[in-house]
Amino acid sequence: MLQRPAAFSACGVVTLTTDFGLKDPFVGVMKGRLVAHFPAVRIIDLTHEIPAHWPAEAGFWLARSFRHFPLGTVHVAVVDPGVGSAREIAAVEAEGHLFLAPDNGLLGPVLDTATSVIARRVAAPVLVRLGIDAPSATFHGRDIFAPLAARIAASQLAPADLGAPTDELVPGWIEQPRVTAGQVAGTVVTIDHFGNLITDIDARHLHGLPHPVVRVASRELPVRRTYSDVRPGDYLALVNSFGVLEIARAERSAAEGLGLARGAPVVVVTK
C-alpha cells in the first residue's frame, strides 16, 4: 500500500454505494440522517444494486467511478455482512477523496489502484465523542456511516481526526488478472443491466497483445471498438467506458446467451 499525503478538502458531496436495493426504506433513512446532520449536503447515489453481501463488487465500481466526482467528495460504501460484529470501520483518503466503508476488503480495489493513499481505522473514541457509541446491531449505515460522513462533508471533522494511519486494512477480494507472454487470464466480476459481462481485465493489460481475441465459454470473440461494429445478436469484446474489458452481445444479453455468471474465466490471447 502506497502512503503519501492526499490533500482532502470537503466539498459537501456524499456518494452512497450499498447492497440495500430500493424496495425497503434503508436508503431513504440513511439520506435522512445525512441531511439531519448536514442540511446542505449533496447526496449522489452511485448504486444500491450491489449483490447482497458482496463487498468486492462495491469496491470494483468505486475504484472506477470516484474520479468522476469533485475533489473533496466523501464516498460511503455499505456492503456489510459483518454488521454488528467486531469488524472495524475503514477510512481511506485517495487522490483528494475520502472513502468510508466496513473494513472487510471492500476498499481493496481503491487501495490497489489509487496513486496516493492514507488508510485509517476509525478509532472508537472518535465515535464516542460524536455520540455514536450505541448503534443498532444491524444498521450501521444509518447509525454510524451517515452521521460520520455528514460531519466530514460539513468540514466539522477532518480525516486525520479519525485515527492513526495504518497499512493493515483487510485486503481486497478481487485477484489481479494473470499476465504472461501473449496471454491475460481474468474473470467476470459483474454483469450490468444490459447483460454485458464486466471483467477485471483493464485496457492496459491488452497493450502487449497486438491482435487480441477473447476466449470465453468455448468461443473466440473479436475485440472491437463499439457495439455497432458487429451485427445484432453477434458477440464481441470491447473496452468499455470504465476502461475494462467486457463481453457483449449486440442488442442482446451476453450473460443469457452464453450462460455465464460472475466468476467465469476469461482469457485474452494474441492471434
PLM regions: where:
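N-terminal glycine-/serine-/threonine-rich phosphate-binding loop
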Residues: M1-A86
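Structural motif
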Residues: G12-T15, V41-I44, T73-V76, I89-A91, ...
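Active-site histidine-anchored catalytic micro-motif
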Residues: H37-R42, W54-E57, P70-G72, V76-V78, ...
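Anionic-ligand-binding alpha/beta catalytic cores of soluble enzymes and soluble regulatory domains
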Residues: I132-D200, H205-G208
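Surface-exposed interaction regions enriched in Ser/Thr/Asp/Glu
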Residues: L258-K271
